[in-house]
């Protein structure tokens, strides 16, 4: 049985770069790397068949439906994956890997597409909270016969710590924006407003690493304008990423909700101090006695 891992088909950006490395997509890329390590010989679904150093890429049409399990991180198009592989009548095997909270999407068509995928194919969620969202969507958005056949489970993925570097305190305290996107859920404006207030009182630097699409946004331009800000693209290699994390003093989390807080866990392991909103998702991310939770932006400024 071949394991085929599919991710990144929804935004049109490349999945693998010219050097044969997976393009950084935060938690999604890390999950793909984990799966490739867990299942030697697994392939990555791409737009063309290619051989890379350490793994192989194949198109959906070149996979044998009878001998392949597709683990789909793009759950919203699982039905389309099935239809592509079912053209000759074979019954393909699919597993939804819901690594983002479903609330990442907003349009009713997206919810309907996801719910149909949840009902038709088994779904593994990253964290109990995400599994709860998936279960509730299935209950609300689909008919009873389909809802009853949904198979939903969850796992706490954890993080890799084999690349962790020794923490180094920078000369100027550096605060990390702990995300690669500037979506409304991440509330980058709140982050930037807090940083402006901190920078008016203390000598501080801000570091932001964004996906290619987010780098071209108006919000990214605003974040890069202060002289104490450094805004750039994602690192090409995981080693570079961990070396940079080791030099972070702190990070400020401003998200409304998260699936399992992948970026926050990595930053904490690397030695950065995390300042979190006093929200249920954040409380579940760290130990019970963790001290740095803010209820207002004034408190966030004070803690930083």
Segments the model singles out, each with a brief description of its role:
Residues 107-150:
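A short, active-site helix/loop in glycosyltransferases that binds the activated sugar's phosphate group
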Residues 6, 165-186, 192-199, 207:
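Conserved donor-binding/catalytic core segment of Leloir-type glycosyltransferases
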Residues 217-238:
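Nucleotide-activated donor-binding/catalytic signature segment of Leloir-type glycosyltransferases, i.e.
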